[in-house]
UniProtKB/Swiss-Prot annotation:
InterPro entries: GINS_A, GINS_bundle-like_dom_sf, GINS_Psf2, PSF2_N. The GINS complex plays an essential role in the initiation of DNA replication. Has a role in chromosome segregation. The gene is PSF2. Component of the GINS complex which is a heterotetramer of SLD5, PSF1, PSF2 and PSF3. Residues 220-250 are annotated as: Disordered. This is DNA replication complex GINS protein PSF2. It holds the Pfam family Sld5. Belongs to the GINS2/PSF2 family. GO terms for biological process: chromosome segregation; DNA replication; double-strand break repair via break-induced replication.
């Protein structure tokens, strides 16, 4: 008998989707543009930087044809600030995600370049893992990107051992918050759980646990509602019998 498929994305599927994130590379060799399903990649001309999908950047790194520039949020100073934010400043919430990119007009006023578009872009189509990404804010695929860069381009990351330690601390803190935040759902159907700033891998790993808690709360609420209705029906039946006796003069 085959087991049912798990609901949602598995961690391996999330890691596969993460490979579409754009990262910044410094090419060592010239490379012409490549036609991909997602569009045409920029032509690589050393030493000019270019943004490429993560999977292609890792492939060029393995071939020693490019170096990967880690995003600013993967710097040790930035990770220390995020850990401080998670453990000291906001012990119940998560670090805020990076803001949408802003572009200055002719008058110097910043605006969202995608505001006029009908399509709302989200990761991996936002530059949240390139060298222009803001520091101090974790993107949606922060954990997967960090693991892949440390596995395949650790020599391009400054203080890689310290980065690994900070990422481990950050993962443990956020995992504990994810487990404790489900206590907000114990109040019934009105329980609300904020997921702003939670990453893709964290959602995939906690999906089964959170869904189990929500389903248990739903069953408890349904049982309570059924009991209340039965009591109301029994009370209504007794009142009808008493009214009938009064009408008959008994």
């Amino acid at each position: 008998m085959a087991l049912p498929l798990p609901s949602g994305l598995t961690p391996s599927e999330v890691a596969f989707l993460c490979e579409m994130e754009l990262v910044t590379v410094v090419p060592r060799q010239r490379l012409e543009s490549i036609e991909l399903l997602t569009g045409t990649t920029p032509a690589l001309r050393p030493p000019h930087r270019s943004n490429l999908p993560l999977w292609l950047a890792i492939l060029l790194k393995k071939q020693r044809r490019a170096n990967i520039v880690p995003p600013p949020w993967l710097h040790p100073d930035s990770l220390r600030d995020i850990v401080h934010q998670e453990t000291m400043v906001d012990r119940k919430g998560w670090a805020p995600p990076p803001p949408p990119p802003a572009r200055a007009d002719s008058r110097g006023n910043a605006r969202n370049p995608f505001m006029d578009d009908e399509t709302v872009l989200s990761p991996p189509f936002l530059p949240s893992c390139t060298s222009d990404a803001p520091a101090g804010a974790l993107p949606y695929h922060w954990f997967e990107v960090a693991e892949m860069l440390l596995a395949h381009a650790s020599d391009d990351i400054s203080s890689s051992s310290e980065v690994r330690s900070l990422l481990r601390d950050l993962q443990e803190v956020r995992a504990a918050k994810m487990r404790s935040s489900t206590a907000q759902l114990e109040g019934g159907v009105d329980g609300v759980m904020s997921l702003r700033g939670v990453g893709a891998m964290e959602l995939a790993e906690s999906r089964g646990f959170v869904i189990g808690v929500v389903e248990g709360v739903r069953k408890l609420g349904a049982s309570t509602e059924t009991t209340r209705r039965e009591e109301e029906e029994e009370g209504g039946g007794q009142e009808s019998d008493e009214q009938s006796d009064e009408d008959m003069g008994l």
